[in-house]
């Protein structure tokens, strides 16, 4: 009986921890694992992330409701190995981990910037698949 209760407690702990996989990640690959699990929940047909889709997402310019076209490369530059500039003229460190090894090492920062930038560019939250494709692309940049 006691073993059964312990097993249930362990199972409950795993179930409760599942949604916060992204919050506990320490590397880009761990972030991708968390986003993959989330993408599979959001979209049962999900199979894997695509660097090609991520590159397309990064380079795309999208018209916003105010008529202004916005895209990642608008501030981050066409080359994610290069430093970018915000609209307020502040420096942005390179997005590609090959040029900025600290990129994607702090899950809270990753989510903070996806939150801000997705809402600014897309006028909505990014999906887990979009986030994963985006990171897969940036990891592929050499």
Q: For the regions a protein language model found, what residue spans apply to each?
A:
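Bacterial N-terminal signal peptides that target proteins for export
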Residues: 1-12
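Bacterial N-terminal signal peptides
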Residues: 10-20
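Boundary at the C-terminal end of the N-terminal hydrophobic targeting segment
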Residues: 23-28
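Electrostatic cytochrome c docking/interface patches
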Residues: 29-66
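The canonical Cys-X-X-Cys-His
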Residues: 69-79, 134
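Short cysteine/histidine-rich zinc-coordinating motifs and their immediately flanking basic loops
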Residues: 84-91
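Short microdomains enriched in Cys/His and/or Lys/Arg
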Residues: 93-108
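C-terminal capping alpha-helices of c-type cytochrome domains
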Residues: 109-142
């Amino acid at each position: 009986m006691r073993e059964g209760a312990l097993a249930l407690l362990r199972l409950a702990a795993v179930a409760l921890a599942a949604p916060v996989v992204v919050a506990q990640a320490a590397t880009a690959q761990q972030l991708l694992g968390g986003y993959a699990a989330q993408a599979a929940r959001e979209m049962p047909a999900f199979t894997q992330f695509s660097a090609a889709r991520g590159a397309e997402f990064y380079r795309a310019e999208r018209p916003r409701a105010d008529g202004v076209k916005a895209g990642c490369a608008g501030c981050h530059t066409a080359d994610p190995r290069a430093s970018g500039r915000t609209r307020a003229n502040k420096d942005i460190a390179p997005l590609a981990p090959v040029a900025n090894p600290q990129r994607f090492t702090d899950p809270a920062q990753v989510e903070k910037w996806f939150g801000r930038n997705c809402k600014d560019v897309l006028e909505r939250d990014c999906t887990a698949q979009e986030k994963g494709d985006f990171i897969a692309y940036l990891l592929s940049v050499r």
